[in-house]
From Swiss-Prot:
One of its GO terms (cellular component) is extracellular region. PANTHER family: ENDO-XYLOGALACTURONAN HYDROLASE A-RELATED, PTHR31736. Its main location: secreted. The keyword Protease does not apply. GO terms for biological process: cell wall organization; pectin catabolic process. It comes from Aspergillus tubingensis. Residues 1-18 form the signal peptide. This is Endo-xylogalacturonan hydrolase A. Disulfide bonds: none annotated.
Length: 406
């Protein structure tokens, strides 16, 4: 893992052994200052500010800067499409607040769409910028109608050299951030993300990050409070780094789910410096079993390092029967191929839900379970530390107890 990261760093720096030129060149007279636009806000929630923002993008979206000033509020009653941006800098220092209109948002993919954009900074320089998905009505409706289709707050598909930083994202109707479509060189940094319901209905499916088909995605210095996966590595994610993250109330940092209806793969993932609070698991891998329409899942070169477990139900979990019941999996065992999976330097205390069990490793009987564990110092509240295992290697690195499931 370190090798690919170092090679990528060297390539990105463009290191050269050539000596610096002593020739002094006159300034290029063709270089101009970046154009700066500040959209005009309508001033109340009945006015959709998206057209004004779109106009600013038309004027300044090609190499320019769009500024939402500190203390300002913009009401977004429709999809904000950033597709016209090219090497643009969008500085959100005020509040972008989306409408809660469940009829309008029904079936829509995104609230902010970033499709095939090359060069985008969506950021707050002051840390005061907020993007509010206003998802309460969507969560309440979904609680009574699970067929209601909700949009992702920020949906990236394709494109390259994208930076999202310094912002607070709050209350998305569904997922916070999604990356797919072959996007490459995407950085999320210094983000505060929270989904908090004011009713008895939880903010369901509010994944922090769904990383699908993409390469070289980095997530760093992020705090997430939500009600689903904190980070999910979806099919075809490759070369993803997560460094310094705190997740509260989540389903953990997860590979998958994979293999539901096709052959899926996830590879070259490195996660380090995670604090997992009140999560169903700190980290894990979720794969569907064989049989039916399910495909084969391949997971390779994945490292989970330096995790602090704080009242999470499991420290680590492998599920090879995801989405099916035990009877099905007796007839159709898991066949996922797991290779070079490293779990290292886990510490802390689980919740009492499964005490004395702290981890549940259910590798598929018809698959491959190439996993190693080291520096695993997690205990249940009782002080015990049992690890349930099935079909794991003899040199796993921890003492196993039979009885794994999932």
């Amino acid at each position: 893992m370190a090798l690919y990261r170092n090679l990528y760093l060297l390539a990105s720096l463009g290191l050269s052994s050539a000596a610096p030129s002593k020739v002094q060149r006159a300034p290029d007279s063709s270089i101009h200052a970046r154009a700066v636009c500040t959209p005009t806000a309508g001033g109340d929630s009945s006015t959709d500010d998206v057209p004004a923002i779109t106009e600013a993008l038309s004027s300044c979206g090609n190499g320019g800067t769009i500024v939402f000033p500190e203390g300002s509020t913009y009401y977004l009653n429709s999809v904000l499409d950033l597709g016209s941006c090219s090497d643009c800098d969008i500085q959100v220092e005020g509040l972008l607040k989306f409408a809660s209109d469940t009829d309008y948002w029904s079936g829509r993919t995104a609230m902010i769409s970033v499709s095939n954009v090359d060069g985008l900074k969506l950021r707050s320089l002051t840390g005061s910028g907020v993007i509010d998905g206003n998802g309460q009505d969507a969560w309440d409706l979904f609680a009574s109608d699970s067929s209601y289709s909700r949009p992702t707050l920020l949906y990236i598909t394709g494109g390259s050299n994208l930076e999202i930083s310094g912002l607070r994202q709050k209350n998305p109707p569904n997922v916070f951030n999604s990356v797919k479509g072959g996007a490459t060189n995407v950085v999320f940094s210094n983000l505060k993300m929270d989904a908090n319901s004011k009713s008895d209905n939880p903010p369901k499916n509010t994944d922090g990050f769904d990383i699908g088909e993409s390469t070289y995605v980095t997530i760093t210095e992020v705090t997430v409070v939500n009600d689903d996966d904190c980070v999910a590595f979806k099919p075809s994610s490759n070369y993803v780094t997560v460094d310094t993250i705190s997740c509260t109330g989540s389903h953990g940092i997860s590979v998958g789910s994979l293999g539901k209806s096709s052959d899926d793969s996830v590879k070259n993932i490195y996660v380090t410096g995670a604090t997992m609070i009140n999560s169903t698991k700190a980290a894990g891998i979720k794969t569907y079993p064989s049989g039916g329409d399910h495909g084969t899942s391949t997971v390779s070169n994945v490292t989970f390092n330096d995790f602090t477990v704080d009242n999470s139900d499991y420290a680590f979990q492998i599920q090879s029967c995801y989405g099916e019941d035990d009877d099905y999996c007796e007839e159709n065992p898991g066949n996922a191929k797991l290779t070079d999976i490293v779990v290292s330097s886990f510490s802390g205390t689980t919740s009492d839900k499964y005490d004395p069990v702290v981890a549940n490793l259910d590798c598929g009987a018809d698959g491959t379970c190439g996993i190693s564990i080291s520096g695993f110092d997690v205990k249940a509240p009782s002080g015990k530390s049992e690890v349930l295992c099935a079909n794991t290697p003899s040199d796993l690195g921890v003492t196993c107890t039979s009885g794994a499931s999932g």
